UniProtKB/Swiss-Prot annotation:
This is Phosphomethylpyrimidine synthase 2. Pathway: Cofactor biosynthesis; thiamine diphosphate biosynthesis. Disulfide bonds: none annotated. It is an enzyme of class 4 (lyase). Gene3D superfamilies: 6.10.250.620, Radical SAM ThiC family, central domain. Binds 1 [4Fe-4S] cluster per subunit. The cluster is coordinated with 3 cysteines and an exchangeable S-adenosyl-L-methionine. The gene is thiC2. Its EC number is 4.1.99.17. Catalyzes the synthesis of the hydroxymethylpyrimidine phosphate (HMP-P) moiety of thiamine from aminoimidazole ribotide (AIR) in a radical S-adenosyl-L-methionine (SAM)-dependent reaction. It catalyses: 5-amino-1-(5-phospho-beta-D-ribosyl)imidazole + S-adenosyl-L-methionine = 4-amino-2-methyl-5-(phosphooxymethyl)pyrimidine + CO + 5'-deoxyadenosine + formate + L-methionine + 3 H(+). One of its GO terms (molecular function) is carbon-carbon lyase activity. InterPro entries: ThiC, ThiC/Bza_core_dom, ThiC/BzaA/B. Belongs to the ThiC family. NCBIfam families: PRK13352.1, thiC.
Amino acid sequence: MTIVEDAKKGIITEEMKIVAKDEGLDPEFIRRGIAAGRIVIPTSPYRQVKICGLGEGLRTKVNASIGVSSDIVDVNMEVQKAIAAEKAGADTLMELGTGGDFLGIRKKVIDSISLSVGSVPLYQAFIEAARKYGSIVHMTEDELFNATEAQAKLGTNFMAIHTGINNITLDRLKAHGRYGGLCSRGGAFMSSWMLHNEKENPLYANFDYLVEILKEHEVVLSTGNGMRAGAVHDATDRAQIQELIINSEVAEKAHQQGLQVIVEGPGHVPLDQIATNVKLMKEMSGHKPFYMLGPLVTDIAPGYDHIVTAIGASVSASYGCDFLCYVTPAEHLALPNLEDVITGVKTSRIAAHVGDMIKYPERARQWDLDMGRARRELDWEKMYSLAIDPEHARAVRNSRAPEDTDACTMCGNFCALKIVNQNYNLAK
């Protein structure tokens, strides 16, 4: 039985107990959430992973994405990035390579970390078709499903599968047009294949077969968003919403068949449309776990898109987004390096916490309360321990060490907190 089938029968599994303990919740709450399709716990019969729950009522989680490109195939660097992402506090990792030996590279990455690992199988199928036949449009349907199964057997825990691109979705995209084009690689691959071959998307047309593969290998389905906007002026357009409708329908169908499902959301969304996107997705999908790629709230800040994303992600999480994909400073510019990955993870972790302060104030705000008290008391060791990046906080202060060890060089002898502590009591 799958974990969904266990949950529907009233069985509380060991994974549910682990998530409940980690979140400070009752195991029965986790069981009910999985049974209803509102919570997922990625696992695998092929490898032991760090158990992590995603969904309503749980802390907002952060995914880090890595992977070689056709220009840069440095396997050791990708392994280092995976290890660094886990150390920096990522909850999951997606290996999205588009070059080299697909299965060999993914195996090395999977073996290097304990996190749940996700993938996009159609990348492998389409790119291997381009190598073999000279063009992505000559991929066969069997090659697509074979790539999916091969990646599942490696121990991949969740997969972004572009089920929401069908002929209706594609018609809406072409009729409406886009200011920023189509930014999803998976969407570009699949739509080009469909138009050239004049055929329906195999992942949509053969959805029951896809579910069989994923169930057999206990892979969580993440409904890919190939029609997401690549520019804020295209956000929440007809093609995006059409894909959301289809993805919500297939998500419901998959869950009924015992599969865990995540629904993916858009990547470029202006601030005033975030609440609409989150609420629309939650209602349409029956409150499935919602995974947003970013989102980026402006398009004018290449080199600083991790900051742009932090703004959007914190608002998204506050409205109910459950799962955030990080964005690095290299977004739209280059393949991220090691430092970009670390920065992306930490920035998104901050955003996730900010969102949780609104979503779950009784749980999330204690961390900030403890930091406020430590600052009042000028307890630097406590402040370091509470910082989201203790090593960085300590290093910054030590790089400009104060004469007065109670204070910092911003205020020196005229530290407001120290002056008040010496003259009257404000403790609360």
